[in-house]
Amino acid sequence: MQSILSSLDKRWRRGGSRMPQLRWQTCLFITINAVIISLLLLDGPVGSGGIAPAIRRLGRALTDFGASGWLIIVSAFLLFEGWATLRVVKSLKTRMQALQICWTGAYLLTSIILSGVIANFLKRTIGRARPQHFEDYGILSFSPFSGHAGFESFPSGHATTIGAFFAAFSLLFPRCRILFLACALWLGMTRVMVGAHYPSDVIAGLALGGWFSLMIAIVYSHYGLLFKTDLDGWPVPKRLLQA
């Protein structure tokens, strides 16, 4: 463990790349406005039961693909499979591939788990009532720290996981970025289709997960792990021989 920490410290000191200009204030402003617009225009119709049965069935068929459990298991498998392979193989190329797989699993794990912890803390702190309680409480009812799942709607934990997972893959495979972002939007909105969340919950969750994956990628790029930084300081995937 000491050798790992020492290696990471050396990588951090060696990484002299500058941080990207994130313009987080602008992005936060856009996200907040998207949430408010969704709350005003979309949350009411969703809460009043304006979702067709066919759409609900579609949502139920797809929504579990965004569950954190299996994504964490797959990520952990990549991490430990890469680590185990690294310990037994001798070929330099194979070791580099194993190291890449190991760090990919670690990146996905940190992005999904830590963003999920934040989302769950926010859900319990805010305590927004879910759509199932719309008739009794409307769209703006809050019961912080109630300990009841029916009052843990904002932000969507599923959407946070989905946002983190697909944002991570967008950064790892930038050529497929549009496809991954479309998948994130569709899977996130299945939470609305099944009546578990309002659209504003999903928008906030997707944004939280996506931004968290970007932050983790920036940290990894500064250490030279899995990512490198481009001329503007943004994380881009490293080629295998650069790992």
Where do the language-model regions lie?
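Alpha-helical membrane-inserting segments
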Residues: 43, 118, 122, 212-220
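Alpha-helical transmembrane segments of integral membrane proteins
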Residues: 24-28, 99-111, 176-179, 204
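Membrane-interfacial segments
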Residues: 50, 82-93, 122-130, 134, ...
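Alpha-helical transmembrane spans of integral membrane proteins, capturing the lipid-embedded, hydrophobic core
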Residues: 29, 33, 108-116, 206, ...
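Membrane-embedded catalytic cores of phosphoryl/pyrophosphoryl-handling enzymes
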Residues: 13-20, 84-85, 137-243
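N-terminal transmembrane-helix/juxtamembrane module of multi-pass inner/ER membrane proteins
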Residues: 1-80, 124-126, 130-146, 243
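Interfacial segments of alpha-helical transmembrane regions
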Residues: 86-120
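Small-polar-interrupted transmembrane alpha-helices in polytopic inner-membrane proteins
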Residues: 39, 110-124, 179-191
